[in-house]
């Protein structure tokens, strides 16, 4: 019977020890000569046999299942367990069962040498597994019932290995070490060669962007501000502007990758995973382009063998050490970041590219855009058509020649764009839409060419990892805003020129109202322009250049640039809808005023006087609203940018003494 017991414990039940799929291994009830206490001891041993049989079934089923799946990946929706992490778990589980198998062999030798040994000896010899097997079975059952997949297996095993039972902890740490072997192989391929070897989608890095887009945030409708102040959400936006998505690292021409945070093991922090993501993306970007480049070497400075050896050393460690792991990742990341810094700052002239961005997107070349506004003024007053874009670019080239900007390498990279009513429909007809566009929501056709004007810039490799399409789109938003302010300023200056031409003629009360309103409008717009150019653009740009020159790390540059762009959008109030809406209303009133003056060079008739009265009231109301918004926030010390704009507008307390209202006087 002892041999029958050893066979049953090895996974081969017989007539004495029977197997039932539901209840497992049990002593047969057909033996009356067995004492109840003996039956109890034997059934206790049978629980070990039950667990062992289920372990071996699990190993055979899923190891074989994985091998079959290599050539036939599972269809989505099948939901079966599969993957190389599962196979590694089975391998580790098999190694943990080896001492149990050896104990049975030793018992067999002992019984052959001494036939008088009792069942109690078997019970004593196998007692060490009575704690181990149920604990490991909990892990196996959890993997099966919850269909745990990929790196989630690491998390499950790790959590159960944190218990206080030494044999259980030791066994699960062995299994975890085998599973980590798979992770280190994937890490080596990703970090050293830019290869994502992940057929079953098990790794914590995936191809494709993460869910959620910034455009949804930017276009989210919020309730407008009451006169009293700002909403809590708007204040949070001001205090915590994180506008650049970390995952938008690569241009669409290259594969995009992102973190799959939901399966990242808890003992690997997200900050370390982001470093791993950055290294792999950078290596892949460099490898993809290296074929076309004459430069020799690699982004890892030919240290692949050294780093591979360090990762292999980590793989050989019986216990995972986050300190050692992060040190190796940091060394690889530092090498990559320094190489990228050299590539971008020294070889690709990043500072020169930023100067181009500032000159064109941020209107640094003011004389160019002044000439362009004069040239294209009449062309863009009407709603755009299919030929407007071509005409505008011709005007832009002519303006560049007028101001002696004849850089043959630069101008072809810049292109003014016009979004006219039929453009999206044509694009839809010619190409399938893969990604929901920002323009899918029905919008009104632009009222003028100015409203539809944008700027595009062809970014050269490798600067595309810094100036992504999402980043350039944000620059475009700033460009449109700055151009609208500059255009209003130019129109008000033109009105002043008209006023000077007629100053020798007799004027009436309406003329006094008209020119005083122009003076107040120019005062507000000039100070807004000064605030944007000096307090925002020049200040932030000089900080950006200082940060770039004080580091040799690409990630630091990228974060500094992200911060720069975030500050531009925040400090120019593009994201603070109450202020932005109020400023736009003021600019629209200025446009209307300039149109009225240009069309009525002489004294205003009754209809013109009525229009002027409406403009005076509107400007008075909007300037009052702006003053109240700026004052309410300033009093709470929440936003220094609003306080700075108020300082520019109210530097001599005229605004305050006028009751926070400009342009309000009797007709």
Swiss-Prot record:
Principal subcellular localization: cytoplasm
GO biological process, one term: microtubule nucleation
Localization (cell): Cytoplasm, Cytoskeleton, Microtubule organizing center, Centrosome
Chain intervals for the UniProt region annotation (Disordered): 424-446
The entry's keywords: Cytoplasm, Cytoskeleton, Microtubule
Matches recorded under InterPro entries: GCP, GCP_C, GCP_C_sf, GCP_N
Gene Ontology terms for molecular function: gamma-tubulin binding
Gene Ontology CC: centrosome; microtubule; recycling endosome; spindle pole
Role description: Component of the gamma-tubulin ring complex (gTuRC) which mediates microtubule nucleation. The gTuRC regulates the minus-end nucleation of alpha-beta tubulin heterodimers that grow into microtubule protafilaments, a critical step in centrosome duplication and spindle formation.
UniProt similarity note: Belongs to the TUBGCP family.
Subunit structure: Component of the gamma-tubulin ring complex (gTuRC) consisting of TUBGCP2, TUBGCP3, TUBGCP4, TUBGCP5 and TUBGCP6 and gamma-tubulin TUBG1 or TUBG2. TUBGCP2, TUBGCP3, TUBGCP4, TUBGCP5 and TUBGCP6 assemble in a 5:5:2:1:1 stoichiometry; each is associated with a gamma-tubulin, thereby arranging 14 gamma-tubulins in a helical manner. Gamma-tubulin at the first position is blocked by TUBGCP3 at the last position, allowing 13 protafilaments to grow into a microtubule.
Protein name: Gamma-tubulin complex component 4
Gene source species: Mus musculus (Mouse)
Source species taxonomy: Eukaryota, Metazoa, Chordata, Craniata, Vertebrata
